[in-house]
UniProtKB/Swiss-Prot annotation:
Molecular function per GO: identical protein binding; lipase binding
PANTHER family: PERILIPIN, PERILIPIN-5
Modified residues (Phosphoserine): 17, 175, 349
Sequence segments annotated as region (Interaction with LIPE): 1-123
Official protein name in the record: Perilipin-5
Modified how: Phosphorylated by PKA. Phosphorylated on serine in skeletal muscle at rest or upon lipolytic stimulation.
Compositionally biased spans, kind Polar residues: 17-26
Gene that this polypeptide is encoded by: Plin5
Subcellular compartments: Lipid droplet; Cytoplasm; Mitochondrion
Region Disordered, residue ranges: 1-31, 447-475
Annotated stretches, region: Recruits mitochondria at the lipid droplet surface: 456-475
GO annotation, biological process: lipid droplet organization; lipid storage; mitochondrion localization; negative regulation of fatty acid beta-oxidation; negative regulation of lipase activity; negative regulation of lipid catabolic process; negative regulation of peroxisome proliferator activated receptor signaling pathway; negative regulation of reactive oxygen species metabolic process
Function statement: Lipid droplet-associated protein that maintains the balance between lipogenesis and lipolysis and also regulates fatty acid oxidation in oxidative tissues. Recruits mitochondria to the surface of lipid droplets and is involved in lipid droplet homeostasis by regulating both the storage of fatty acids in the form of triglycerides and the release of fatty acids for mitochondrial fatty acid oxidation. In lipid droplet triacylglycerol hydrolysis, plays a role as a scaffolding protein for three major key lipolytic players: ABHD5, PNPLA2 and LIPE.
Length: 475
């Protein structure tokens, strides 16, 4: 819009304030502009800069496009003509409404004053307003971003704090549980498998050193895995010593019974030959019979009584030997077939002796050949017991042991129908590592293995074999 359009637009407002100028001829032009709301609005820097920018764009568009410029100039001419004609015809009406227009102008000026007070940017150019708006938006966005970053940092710190607190509580709970379990396990091991005399002497020797705490204090200073590994190794060692002690006790008892039975067989042999035996017997009953035998050689009644007592003693020793061998057989359950074969050989010898004296009513019923075979069987059983213990001492994997950690084994004619269910109730779910094993078939295969024709056992391995009882706890 060119200058003519502006002049036409302001003509109406000039005429509106014409009467006021006539009534107050002493007022200045500045005061008149201050009371004309349209001029004040146009004089605002923001409006003036905006109008200047719009006018510049309008003129530039007219100059750039000739057709558009011709149309715009024609429109401007029409608007100016219409406005001039309208002002000429509206002059009487404007003169009639002059007081009311003055009142409206005054109210509008007051409202503009308040608006300028509330909106100071109206007194600033558009470039300054745009720059201020950009700065305000940038500050707002920066504040929001900072707030979001602080919230994210706070949430991260809160999450880390909660995680550390939970880790601390969990670690403390696990530590206390591990201490309790290890302590209770060590107490149970000390109770059921006490230390041997050699271990007690070694511990007493170590405690004489400077600044050596008790066993409990030393255990508390060790780590969990060290304590667990030490407990596993100690448990294996004590279990080995315990089982070995049981085997030695059974061996000594069996050999003692075999020695007494051997002396009894020698006594029977002397009785059959009517010779006086040499008093080299350890069993009190055998010594008594040996002492009573010589005086009663000439007394037939006393001779028969001594024979009956000797047979009764032989049967009693055979039964005691049978129970001792059964106890030894119970200790070797789970050992390899070679070790079980030794015990089975001893059992067969004892069964043969028991059959020899089962049907005898007097010493004459015992054949000299059966008596000699019995002595050979006793000597062979004695040697088998020694060989068995030597075999166990040379190579005894702890997985063979059936000691205090296994339930009592009971012989049955046939396996239980619900054997798998019973085993699962004891050991939990079946271990997939052994699911493919057919244990009854393996046991039958072991029993069906032919004996060594040479009567000699295979040589044990020269190297030391590492035996593992609990692979999960072997570090």
């Amino acid at each position: 819009m060119d200058q003519r359009g502006k002049d036409t637009t302001l003509a109406l407002h000039s005429r509106m304030s014409g009467d006021q100028t006539a009534q107050d001829p002493g007022s200045s032009l500045g005061e008149l502009d201050q009371h004309n709301v349209v001029k004040r609005v146009v004089a605002l820097p923001l409006v003036r800069a905006t109008c200047t920018a719009v006018s510049g764009a309008y003129n530039s568009a007219k100059d750039r496009h000739p057709l558009l410029g011709s149309a715009c100039r024609f429109a401007e001419h029409c608007v100016c003509s219409v406005a001039t004609c309208a002002l000429d015809h509206a002059q009487p009406l404007l003169e009639h409404l002059q007081p009311k227009l003055a009142t409206v102008n005054d109210l509008a000026c007051r409202g503009l004053d308040k608006l300028e007070e509330k909106l100071p940017f109206l007194q600033q150019p558009s470039d300054t307003v745009v720059t201020s708006a950009k700065d305000a938006v940038a500050k707002s966005v920066t504040g929001v971003v900072d707030l979001a970053q602080r919230g994210r940092r706070w949430s991260g710190e809160l999450r880390r704090s909660v995680s550390q607190a939970m880790d601390t509580v969990l670690r403390r709970s696990v530590s206390q549980a591990m201490d309790t379990v290890l302590g209770k396990s060590e107490e149970l091991v000390d109770h059921f498998l006490p230390m041997t005399e050699a271990e007690l002497v070694a511990l007493a020797t170590e405690s004489q050193g400077p600044e050596v705490g008790s066993v409990e204090e030393q255990r508390q200073k060790q780590g969990y895995f060290v304590r667990l590994g030490s407990l596993s190794a100690r448990l294996r060692h004590l279990a080995y010593q315990h089982s070995l002690g049981k085997l030695r006790e059974s061996k000594h008892r069996t050999q003692e019974m075999l020695a007494q039975l051997q002396k009894t067989l020698e006594l029977i042999q002397h009785m059959q030959s009517r010779a006086s035996p040499t008093p080299t017997f350890h069993h009190p009953k055998v010594q008594e019979l040996c002492g009573d035998w010589s005086p009663c050689l000439e007394n037939g009644y006393r001779h028969s009584q001594v024979e009956l007592e000797t047979l009764a003693l032989s049967r009693s020793l055979t039964l005691e030997l049978q129970s001792a061998v059964d106890a030894l057989a119970g200790c070797v359950r789970g050992l390899p077939p070679s070790a079980q074969a030794k015990v089975a050989e001893v059992q067969r010898s004892v069964d043969a002796l028991q059959a020899t004296f089962a049907d005898a009513h007097c010493l004459g019923d015992v054949a000299p050949t059966a008596l000699a075979e019995g002595q050979d069987s006793v000597a062979q059983a004695h040697a088998c017991v020694d060989e068995f213990l030597d075999l166990v001492l040379r190579a005894m994997p702890l997985a063979w042991l059936v000691g205090p950690f296994a339930p009592i084994l009971v012989e049955r004619s046939e396996p239980l129908i619900n054997l798998a269910t019973c085993v699962d109730e004891v050991v939990g779910d079946p271990d997939p590592r052994w699911a493919h094993m057919d244990w009854p078939a393996q046991q039958r295969a072991w029993e069906a293995e032919p004996a060594d024709p040479g009567g000699q056992e295979a040589e044990p391995p020269l190297g030391q074999v590492k035996h593992t009882m609990m692979p999960e706890l072997d570090f």
